[in-house]
Amino acid sequence: MTTPPPRPAAPTTDPGDTPTWAMILGRLTTGQSLLPGQTAWAMDQIMTGVATPAQIAAFAVSMKMKRPTSAEVTELAEIMLKHALPVPTDTIGTHTVDIVGTGGDGANTVNLSTMASIVVAAAGVPVVKHGNRAASSLSGGADTLEALGLRIDLGPDDVARCVAEVGIGFAFAPQFHPSYRHAGAVRREIGVPTVFNLLGPLTNPAKPRAGLIGCAWGDLAEVMAGVFATRGSSALVVHGDDGLDELTTTTTSTIWRVQAGTVERLTFDPAAFGFARAHVSELTGGDAEANAASAREVLGGATGPVRDAVLLNAAGAMVAHAGLSSDAKWVPAWESGLARAKEAIDSGAAEQLLARWVRFTQEL
């Protein structure tokens, strides 16, 4: 039997060495994780415009192929936040919640997280939603909110005012992460998922303590959960077993429950809470105008598969928020979240909150 040739070694590095791109890429392309501080150095080079497009592309792809660790992604996210415009939290605090996904599932569903965010806020839980325009679908959360009449270009102080006055604010990613433009251009040119796809849900400039976070890649959801655990957040990182970056109603979902610095992996079946199985085609969306129309219908009380999925994700966000309390119980938290989500829609509160939010942003 022929012995395969040895794998080429990365350049020898000492933890005290000043990083270089040859050192970083040498480790990644030979399947080795980076040493503490090396990922942060690379991301800082990217965010400050020092890294070349070739270096950025090589880093993003090789990190994804190697499979990033939670420690590496934590460094990426923290450097990105260091360069971000922060949402002031002196009036809104950090006990807010975000509902956001990585995108990239290829299903082109309606904007479930956007609708769920409005429902959660109408139920009395403060929301700071972080989002962007569509990258791979026909309509991202920002596109749909804009079609609903919302001003999406608000700065940090005005987003905080929205949360304080209305109960919900939208942080449009390009507005808060101007330094990310160097990576963003390369990411669009590459056209395939990279480690950068994980960063949107991890870099909300308001730093909410709770989140319902969707991940389109099951093998990377646990990595994201590890980042939230390091931060001491309460989060549900979810991956639909049909591939959606949402809590799905077509089958079961896998949930990584993050609470008090620990991560627990669970299988979640919405049928246990009375939800009928849907087909993914019943959740398919369209362009921004079509998705805005769907949002108006659901928030106006229309029943059906889209409402079910919105209720499920809204409840999940409230479960994550409840997890900020050490005595939160799993099943009772779900029962409470679902009841509050239904009441928020059926009472008209969600529809009214959307109208108030749109009006408030237009008057700023």
UniProtKB/Swiss-Prot annotation:
Pathway: Amino-acid biosynthesis; L-tryptophan biosynthesis; L-tryptophan from chorismate: step 2/5. It comes from the Bacteria. It catalyses: N-(5-phospho-beta-D-ribosyl)anthranilate + diphosphate = 5-phospho-alpha-D-ribose 1-diphosphate + anthranilate. GO terms for molecular function: anthranilate phosphoribosyltransferase activity; magnesium ion binding. Anthranilate 1 binds at residues 101, 132. One of its GO terms (cellular component) is cytosol. GO terms for biological process: L-tryptophan biosynthetic process. Its cofactor is Mg(2+). This is Anthranilate phosphoribosyltransferase. Its EC number is 2.4.2.18. It is an enzyme of class 2 (transferase). Catalyzes the transfer of the phosphoribosyl group of 5-phosphorylribose-1-pyrophosphate (PRPP) to anthranilate to yield N-(5'-phosphoribosyl)-anthranilate (PRA). Anthranilate 2 binds at residue 187. Binds 2 magnesium ions per monomer. Keywords: Amino-acid biosynthesis, Aromatic amino acid biosynthesis, Glycosyltransferase, Magnesium, Metal-binding, Transferase, Tryptophan biosynthesis. The gene is trpD. Mg(2+) 1 binds at residues 113, 246.
